[in-house]
């Protein structure tokens, strides 16, 4: 941690953006990063969009959003990903959402369950997301993307991928 902190300071880093909710929590809670703002990429993309620095094309695509455990319940970030999705298409919510969202079976549980159990959990969660009628499942966590991708034939994208596809 000391090495990373010194590296950030040496290079004058004032904002640190991560796509991983677990990394977000670690940088925010375990590092002494006074003067360095730590953001999840959903927060950063929304900030850029609101400042007029990120122009997106809205389409008719229907997106179902999966709340990552560590991003939502762990860090309280629910609205930023949804606002970004709503800028590019229709947001559909599964039955279990926000603080009641189902775990994809990855993350910390990945060390405590078998691969087969993880896939069964992912299929169950993916089934709920598919039931929304969405064309694309969106999440904001690389572990969730990987897990959900193993549980469905529906396209699964990270929020950043969706944004990249919709840049003006």
Predicted feature residues:
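Iron-sulfur cluster-binding electron-transfer modules in prokaryotic oxidoreductases
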Residues: 1-168
């Amino acid at each position: 941690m000391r090495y990373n902190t010194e590296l950030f300071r040496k290079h004058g880093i004032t904002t640190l953006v991560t796509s991983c909710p677990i990394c977000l929590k670690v940088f925010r809670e375990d590092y002494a990063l006074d003067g360095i703002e730590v953001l999840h990429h959903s927060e950063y993309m929304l900030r850029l969009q609101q400042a007029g620095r990120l122009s997106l094309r809205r389409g008719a695509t229907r997106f179902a959003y999966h709340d990552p455990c560590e991003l939502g319940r762990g860090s309280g970030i629910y609205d930023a990903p949804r606002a970004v999705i709503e800028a590019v298409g229709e947001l559909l919510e599964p039955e279990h959402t926000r603080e009641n969202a189902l775990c994809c079976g990855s993350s910390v549980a990945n060390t405590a369950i078998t691969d087969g159990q993880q896939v069964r959990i992912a299929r169950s969660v993916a089934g709920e997301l598919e039931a929304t009628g969405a064309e694309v499942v969106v999440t904001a966590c690389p572990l969730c993307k990987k897990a959900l991708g193993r549980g469905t034939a529906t396209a699964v994208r990270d929020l950043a991928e969706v944004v990249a596809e919709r840049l003006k």
